[in-house]
């Protein structure tokens, strides 16, 4: 081990020394360039669309069944193509958990430009780009192109992937699997027929950007990136786009055994033209005998159709019923519709006009309903791990709750099925419902699995014995603030850890969010169940640390659902205070202008105005800051720039009672954060990477676990919660010797009060027992990485002509910025 450390220090010293570059010591190998995806090469070999006939297997599968926490989304599979209908928040996470391959997804269809349908699209596009997919085609409302333009404000240029937009007015689309027809549908008299929480379009004269958020003076107006239009678009909430999808004809299968019985030259080159002829429906003559095509082939499948239609409210019913394109597919034997997917609320389904429209498709057409009445567990792995963690400490790791459906669906005279996560309808080879993939949540199985793990029960019992000397649970749980970790992973949502979001319950009736990544509302639903509206009603402010997608793309859904919650609680609506980099306003402004009205939801406080010594020139901002402090009962809300991307901030909350919570956001070790957080009661600090990956941490401007702990110790924080782990540590990070009695590890849905600080370190042994297999795998990966580094060090030493034994090497402190790599700290 001493020799290993010596070699690693030698390699580190040479790579960081002056006059040498990092490239001279190949400790980190560049990733090989991605080859073209295999399915694309296979497609090229098959030739133009339709040349080989239709696919053998086609099915539709429910990704999200329409519940309030998950939205509605549909996945369509064939061996040639993959399709996704709608992409709300959390869809990428569900596809990853249930192994629905994102990398094969080359077509996304959107039924309307509403956040419930597009909230996960920006993250999905970034993931598709990372997989190497060269092109993705998006179909839907005309604002779709402007939406893709707007997300560049925070994603940057989307190089490496071609995003082709097919407007709803374009002619039909055809590929190897099917032909897709887009049907635009406009509501009748849309204006004025809305529920208060649905964010109807207001006249522009009543809602200028200045009126919607008086927090910014002209000097604070955000500047849009190059290529992003500043012109106001035409929002159209009265438009939805339905899709009729017609499968290509599938030629019959050649009956080899029957051909042998007839004496045909099976197994020779002469059989090829015979097969081609009979598959085309032509008869052949063999030895003077005419053989009909149906004697040698199974019957062809003419290709059924399926329909995907969204009917958001009753104002769309009549236009749908009167649509001529739908009428051509209703009750026609030559164009059978196998399935109609209805994304519609109960108020639509019980309407007699809509029911009559459904009946006109005929008795052989199946109907699938996706709406909030569909009760289905979606995030099974999250429920599993929480059930097992609950065995360790039921208060800190509370059980999750499924968001309840309201009531039984309406009784209809057509074959109707309510959606469930992973429910399938197979269109080919035979039409049928398939329920074998539907997930079931069985807590008893999760508990038995955990209790059978070696040393788990023993470690839990030992922890409980050691905890008896602590304060009584009732005393601990009555304290505020209460910290709820809703998302503790980095970069992209994954099956166990969602992306950044932390709820701080300051008091029973006041809370704020620290960051708000994609899927935050869904996490709130799973944590609070039917109490989620009450929690949204207490939300006073949101802090957004920076404009990376994993920290802010859940904000819009929180805003929309909060308005709905206030209406259901009978509370008056008022804008939510949002503390964020000024650039967030540019994104919200673009989405507001082009897609959906949202600016009336926020009152914006630029994060830079809360820095120490910042001058506030706008009286409006001063009023908002005063309101923030008064509403949250805070003595101070301070921000500082941290060492991550441009315009990245950390924050410190100082309560009037004296406690202080500091949140790092994303950052490398940062002196400004240390100064701002001095004597914090609690530091929540990102710990994206494990120890030993300091160089990667610098490259990605993040912190390792020991670096995060060091920041807390220098800050003199009473306790340190590590957060924002790389998804390579899906269940638990690697523990280091620096973990002490002042350090805890955050998990999704973890609930922590200040009275739990003494308990947190005692949880580590049971956690190690629960995740022993995962820790072993991570340690093996670390050993392999260190072995590669040793080999690289030996090679570097050999190339350098060797070093004298005992030559001193000064290991560079990883909390300082290497001279060899200039990292911008804003």
UniProtKB/Swiss-Prot annotation:
One of its GO terms (cellular component) is mitochondrial nucleoid. Pfam families: Lactamase_B_2, Lactamase_B_4. The modification Phosphoserine is found at residues 199, 208, 212, 229, 618, 736. Residues 1-16 form a transit peptide. The keyword Transcription does not apply. It comes from the Eukaryota. Residues 16-51, 188-231, 798-826 are annotated as: Disordered. GO terms for biological process: mitochondrial tRNA 3'-end processing. It catalyses: Endonucleolytic cleavage of RNA, removing extra 3' nucleotides from tRNA precursor, generating 3' termini of tRNAs. A 3'-hydroxy group is left at the tRNA terminus and a 5'-phosphoryl group is left at the trailer molecule. Keywords: Endonuclease, Hydrolase, Metal-binding, Mitochondrion, Mitochondrion nucleoid, Nuclease, Nucleus, Phosphoprotein, Transit peptide, tRNA processing, Zinc. Coiled coil: none annotated. Its EC number is 3.1.26.11. Zinc phosphodiesterase, which displays mitochondrial tRNA 3'-processing endonuclease activity. Involved in tRNA maturation, by removing a 3'-trailer from precursor tRNA. Associates with mitochondrial DNA complexes at the nucleoids to initiate RNA processing and ribosome assembly. This is Zinc phosphodiesterase ELAC protein 2. It comes from Pan troglodytes (Chimpanzee). The lineage of its organism: Eukaryota, Metazoa, Chordata, Craniata, Vertebrata.
């Amino acid at each position: 081990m001493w020799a290993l450390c010596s070699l690693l220090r030698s390699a580190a010293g040479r790579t960081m020394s002056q006059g040498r570059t990092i490239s001279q010591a190949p400790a980190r190998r560049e990733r090989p360039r991605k080859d073209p995806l295999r399915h694309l090469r296979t497609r090229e070999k098959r030739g133009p669309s339709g040349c080989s006939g239709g696919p053998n297997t086609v099915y539709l599968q429910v990704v999200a069944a329409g519940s309030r926490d998950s939205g509605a989304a549909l996945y369509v599979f064939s061996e040639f193509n993959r399709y996704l209908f709608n992409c709300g928040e959390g869809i990428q996470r569900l596809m990853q958990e249930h192994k629905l391959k994102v990398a094969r997804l080359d077509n996304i269809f959107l039924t309307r430009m509403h956040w419930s349908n597009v909230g996960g699209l920006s993250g999905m596009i970034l993931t598709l780009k990372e997989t190497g997919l060269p092109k993705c085609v998006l179909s839907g409302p005309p604002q779709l192109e402007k939406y893709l333009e707007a997300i560049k404000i925070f994603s940057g240029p989307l190089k490496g992937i071609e995003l082709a937009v097919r407007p709803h007015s374009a002619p039909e689309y055809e590929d190897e699997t099917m032909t897709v027809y887009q049907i635009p549908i406009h509501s009748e008299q849309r204006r004025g027929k809305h529920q208060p929480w649905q964010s109807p379009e207001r006249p522009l004269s009543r809602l200028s950007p200045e009126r919607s958020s008086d927090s910014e003076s002209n000097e604070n107006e955000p500047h849009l990136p190059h290529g992003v239009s500043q012109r106001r678009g035409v929002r159209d909430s009265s438009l939805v786009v339905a899709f009729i999808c017609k499968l290509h004809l599938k030629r019959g299968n050649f009956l080899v055994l029957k051909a042998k019985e007839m004496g045909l030259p099976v197994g020779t080159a002469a059989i090829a033209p015979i097969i081609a002829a009979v598959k085309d429906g032509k008869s052949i003559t063999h030895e003077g005998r005419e053989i009909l095509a149906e004697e040698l082939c199974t019957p062809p499948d003419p290709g059924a159709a399926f329909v995907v239609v969204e009917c958001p409210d009753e104002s769309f019913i009549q236009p749908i019923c009167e649509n001529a394109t739908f009428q051509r597919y209703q009750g026609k034997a030559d164009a059978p519709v196998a399935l109609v997917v209805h994304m519609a609320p109960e108020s639509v389904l019980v309407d007699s006009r809509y029911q009559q429209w459904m009946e006109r498709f005929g008795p052989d057409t199946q109907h699938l309903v996706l709406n909030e009445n569909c009760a289905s567990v979606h995030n099974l792995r999250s429920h599993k791990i929480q059930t097992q963690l609950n065995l360790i400490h039921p208060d800190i790791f509370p059980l999750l709750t499924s968001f309840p459906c309201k009531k039984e669906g309406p009784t209809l005279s057509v074959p109707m099925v309510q959606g469930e996560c992973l429910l399938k309808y197979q269109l080919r080879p035979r039409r049928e419902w398939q329920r074998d993939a539907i997930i079931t949540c069985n807590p008893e199985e999760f508990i038995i699995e955990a209790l059978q793990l070696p040393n788990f029960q023993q470690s839990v019992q030992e922890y409980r014995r050691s905890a008896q000397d602590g304060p009584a649970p009732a005393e601990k749980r009555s304290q505020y603030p209460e910290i709820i970790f809703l998302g503790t992973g980095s970069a992209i949502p994954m099956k166990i850890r969602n992306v950044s979001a932390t709820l701080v319950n300051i008091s029973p009736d006041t809370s704020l969010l620290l960051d708000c990544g994609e899927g935050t509302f869904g996490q709130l639903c799973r944590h609070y169940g039917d109490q989620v509206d009450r929690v949204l009603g207490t939300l006073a402010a949101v802090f957004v640390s920076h404009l990376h997608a994993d920290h802010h793309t859940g904000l819009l859904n929180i805003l929309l659902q909060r308005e709905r919650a206030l209406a259901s609680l009978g509370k008056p609506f008022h804008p939510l205070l949002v503390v964020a980099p000024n650039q967030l306003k540019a994104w919200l402004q673009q989405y507001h202008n082009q897609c959906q009205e949202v600016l009336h939801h926020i009152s914006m406080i630029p994060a830079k105005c809360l820095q120490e010594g910042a001058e506030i020139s706008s009286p409006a901002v001063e009023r908002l800051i005063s309101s923030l402090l008064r509403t949250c009962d805070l003595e101070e809300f301070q921000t500082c720039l941290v060492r991550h991307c441009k315009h990245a901030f950390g924050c410190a909350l100082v309560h009037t009672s004296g406690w202080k919570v500091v949140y790092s956001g994303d950052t490398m070790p940062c002196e400004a954060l240390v100064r701002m957080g001095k004597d914090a009661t609690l530091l929540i600090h990102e710990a994206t990477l494990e120890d030993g990956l300091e160089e990667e941490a610098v490259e990605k401007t993040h912190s390792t676990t020991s670096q995060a702990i060091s920041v807390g110790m220098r800050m003199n924080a009473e306790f340190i919660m590590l957060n924002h782990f790389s998804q390579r540590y899906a269940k638990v990070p690697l523990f280091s010797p620096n973990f002490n009695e002042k350090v805890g590890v955050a998990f999704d849905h973890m609930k922590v009060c200040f009275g739990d600080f003494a308990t947190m370190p005692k949880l580590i042994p049971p956690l190690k027992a629960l995740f022993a297999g995962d820790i072993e795998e991570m340690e093996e990966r670390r050993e392999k990485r260190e072995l590669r580094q040793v080999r690289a060090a030996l090679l570097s030493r050999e190339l350098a002509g060797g070093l004298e034994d005992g030559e001193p090497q000064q290991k560079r402190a990883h909390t300082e910025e290497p001279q060899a790599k200039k990292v911008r700290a804003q």
